[in-house]
Amino acid sequence: MSTMALWRSTFIVSAMTMLSRVLGLVRDVVLLNVFGAGKDFDTFVVAFRIPNFFRRLFAEGAFSQAFIPVLTEYKAGRAHAEVQILISRVFGCLLTVMTLLTFVAMVLAPAIIYMYAPGFHNDPEKFDLAVSMFRLTIPYLMFMSLTAFASSILNSYGSFASPAFSPVLLNVAMIAGAWWLTPYMAEPIKALGWSVVAAGILQLAVQIPELWRKNLLIPPKVDFKHEGVERILKLMLPALFGVSVTQINLLLNTIWASFMQDGSVSWLYSAERMTELPLGLIGVAIGTVILPSLSARHAEQDQEKFRGMIDWAAKVIVLVGLPASIALFMLSTPIIQALFQRGEFDLHDTQMTALALQCMSAGVISFMLIKVFAPGFYAQQDTKTPVRVGLMSVAANAILNVVFIGFFKLIHWQAEHMALALASSGSALVNAGLLYFYLHKRNIFRFGSHWKKLILQYGLANLAMIAALWFGLNWYNGELSQWIRIAEVAGLCVVGVIAYLIGLLVSGFRPRDLKH
């Protein structure tokens, strides 16, 4: 892809992601207003996080990172009929594995909940509800795995719109369930479980027309001995771990949080949702767009363009990610107050969530860079290096959790959940740093001398934004109505963006500096 084509594809994914994230914020506002940050919502967060984790692990994570490079190679060097056969065999194998996995997960639900939220076992009512919610939501895994399979095919063919749009349906379904289905349920929280399953079906359905138009809607056939399937499986096994380190760390944090005071899981979840906005808009969007392009450049043995694409992506990530991290830190309390503080979500919940968001904001830029650096290995069908890096990152997360929790207990700090957020940011920094180390060591990519000027320009622009936000916060009043708080936060964001853009302009930065 040319720079213009990369921008166009990134814009499409970012626009759809923006729609999804905005609806996601509306969803969270509705859910926290209806259910609050209490016991019932904690059980839903845990129950839904597990199938969501496996979705990212098997489907969007390891599977897509292994499948897209192989499919791209087939497209480049083989007949369309062979590509269709590959798709058919992968479809059949994936459907078989996910059906079996879903059934096993339903049978082993109590053990799985005990493993991922052992603290719930101390409250039998909470534990039983979590098991019931898990069994209700786990079919989502199968539907979303097939959705990710369809999305990977479409992305490989340069179609990004419908795959990027599908997450919107999850938010719409959950909002509808919370508003209209909850009153009819004996256990209101289960309305969310049924909504999740319905969303999975809808997300798969919207991919079908585009696959049909491209003559890629192929009936499934199970053949684990097919050459392409064997290669994908070989790449997937190590990638199962390496590509999903973030999700593993989040689940480890959920285990820790289940032993903490009620609300800890919900506070961390709400803060995590805020960090996902910039991560999804830019980090995930660019990672989604560049993997097929990097795979194609690798197949063509064009190392110069390969490096150029990573360099372009890193420039965009730092351009957007650094101010996003700073703004989330500075505006943490106003953002949480404006979006969530109403109904069952009170001032105490706002304060606890804002503390978690401040800690998580430090890791936003690292999480975004991971989305750029990791495809540099996967496009070359190297899944082992991210595994080694992932192991070190998980180890760092575990060590930092113990250190920070121990420190907070020592000083009798009540907001222990902050330790988990800090550990997540620290482990993300380790992950991104090590990925870059190996890219540099193997001469795949390194920051050139032009980055010195860019960092100076970015730094000056961020200082301008910090000054503007600091001044604007003096006028913020959290005691006013929610709509006025929302308007105030929107105004602060606009002021920050304007100050940042002026800072870039004054520093000499121009859009042409992003070309690769």
Q: What annotation goes with each model-predicted range?
A:
Residues 1-516:
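Membrane-embedded alpha-helical bundles of multi-pass transporters/translocases
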